């Protein structure tokens, strides 16, 4: 009597067949956490800002000092983000495309702001450009203001935000390799043409994503900017600093009005980030089909 040598495979238990109660419990816990930690506080900010109506809200945003803080925030972000964009692309290109001594050290330096408190970052600039330092004496003698002025705010913001673009691009460029660039160079393209027509299209989504994160952090930075700003009303206060000042003065409508504007900027950043991810996923799917 012959034995059937066919072995029926044992049906593996899939994660998707786990007990429904466990699945729904995990989903409920996640949603509850987001509700308590994120959505309720965010809603409270908007409710408090409009508690007295739209008139006081708009009046608070139209205050001269608040308007100056909004304008200064946009100026600082508008200068620091493009500078960090240029640095991030250059650093990512060097690390991903070339081999050189000190490469690991450069990568570590890029990550430094992630591990250093923003307050310490601000103190570094105070120690570097302070009035009692050699460099501070030289700056004073030449009537150049760094601390308690816009240049100090820009430097502090750049220090805190410069890893974002580079950290988005480095793994992306390493994964892509150097084959495309080498092919372009072998066909006679210049370095600039290679970057503009080959490298940049390949990294555009990661680049935009890094810029969004960098801009969001630049507008919301508090610690480093607080140390170097001097809290001069109407001159060196950014939006986060203005929120603190108004709140400490019990001007809750003004404080929450500015906080609402910051929250809206964060929401816009989140929406743009989601759209970029969707566009990138669609582009990847289309390229795989072809």
Question: Where are these predicted regions, by residue range?
Answer:
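Membrane-interfacial helix termini and adjacent extracytoplasmic/periplasmic loops
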Residues: 10-16, 54-62, 67, 102-103, ...
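Interhelical loop and adjacent transmembrane-helix boundary motif
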Residues: 19-20, 57, 64, 222-272
